[in-house]
């Protein structure tokens, strides 16, 4: 019998090459540096962006939610998108930074993914 608790909650998939984004790497770096200055001044360790607009502004990834939540988590040294498994490796290819994929077979895997960053 298959134990459902052995299934992955999150994973990464770096398949294919990064696609061209709407803005340059330097522009995304500038945007993130500005946000990180505010974070440092307020002693904030991480920011979780959940609106489509903010995710796209800081990461370049524009998604269609299909009823599933997405995020961009910004820390002092990383910018990581959090995406649903339905998109496979596309979010990594189409974002400035890394990506973590959550599976939706178990409740709250999205929050586990966000919390892991």
What are these regions (language model features)?
Residues 1-117:
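A composition/biophysics-driven feature that prefers long, compositionally simple stretches
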């Amino acid at each position: 019998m298959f134990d459902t608790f052995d299934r992955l909650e999150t994973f990464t998939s770096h398949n294919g090459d990064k696609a061209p984004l709407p803005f340059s790497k330097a522009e995304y770096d500038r945007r993130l540096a500005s946000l990180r200055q505010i974070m440092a001044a307020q002693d904030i360790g991480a920011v979780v962006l959940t609106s489509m607009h903010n995710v796209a502004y800081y990461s370049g990834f524009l998604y269609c939610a299909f009823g599933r939540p997405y995020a961009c988590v910004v820390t002092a040294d990383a910018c990581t998108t959090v995406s649903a498994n339905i998109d496979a490796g596309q979010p990594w290819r189409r974002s400035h930074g890394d990506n973590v994929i959550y599976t939706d077979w178990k409740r709250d895997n999205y929050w586990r993914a966000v919390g892991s960053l």
